[in-house]
Regions:
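A broad "ordered helical/assembly scaffold" signature
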Residues: 57, 68, 93, 98, ...
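N-terminal, active-site-proximal structural segment of metallo-dependent hydrolase catalytic domains
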Residues: 1-87, 98-101
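Short, well-ordered loop/turn elements at secondary-structure boundaries
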Residues: 65-66, 106, 182
Length: 202
């Protein structure tokens, strides 16, 4: 399930983490918790299956058989998303979408739904000012068919609070433009990474 072209070296079985090259790469990570994951996390089949089961159990514990629509962030690929969908199919989930973005770590946004997903695309963020040319995760745009009507879903994963607040303003502007571009019922959700101090400013 590993994306070989992505920098996701934390999520590998421990036997792949014993080389000096791997250790050197991990030790260059400045955040200790991330460094420790990179060095010591044993991401094997058993660990992966337990994680999927825990996520599925959390989802179906909400209400009766889970929410109608699930927005996910930091999903590695369609392979793992489909495994989660398979666990959820007995509870009425029928469709999913993940479009591979350009994130170097290979983590993307995704949707799982009890309604048919009829269209989907990514909207990339263009930063302005001093952050022009920087990259971030795009907004996932999905169109669902609900009782014969279209419903638009925007799933976001904005830059973390580690970054300057202006790096969340540009994505919010893109989202605002998308909301104004049509008259369909819309839900915008996901990880906005806006803290309480920023909330009043944005």
């Amino acid at each position: 399930l590993d994306d070989t072209k992505k920098d996701d070296k934390a999520y590998l079985p421990i036997e792949f983490k014993r080389s000096e090259a791997h250790k050197k790469s991990c030790n260059s990570i400045r955040v200790n918790s991330w460094k420790n994951e990179c060095l010591y996390l044993d991401w094997n089949e058993e660990t992966k299956n337990a994680k999927l089961k825990n996520i599925a159990n959390s989802i179906i514990s909400y209400g009766q058989n889970g929410p109608d629509i699930i927005a996910l962030q930091e999903v590695e690929n369609n392979n793992i998303l489909n495994q989660l969908l398979d666990l959820l199919k007995p509870y009425g989930y029928i469709d999913s979408v993940l479009i591979e973005g350009k994130d170097y770590r290979g983590i993307d946004t995704a949707l799982i739904s009890k309604f048919k997903i009829v269209d989907s695309m990514l909207h990339y963020i263009k930063f302005s000012g001093e952050f022009e040319g920087k990259d971030t995760r795009p907004i996932l745009d999905a169109t669902l068919e609900v009782n014969g009507e279209k419903l638009k879903i925007y799933n976001v994963h904005f830059p973390s609070g580690f970054h300057d607040v202006s790096m969340r303003i540009d994505p919010l502007d893109v989202l605002s433009g998308l909301l104004k571009s049509h008259n369909y019922p819309t839900i915008a959700l996901g990880d906005f990474n806006v803290n309480t101090k920023e909330d009043s400013k944005l």
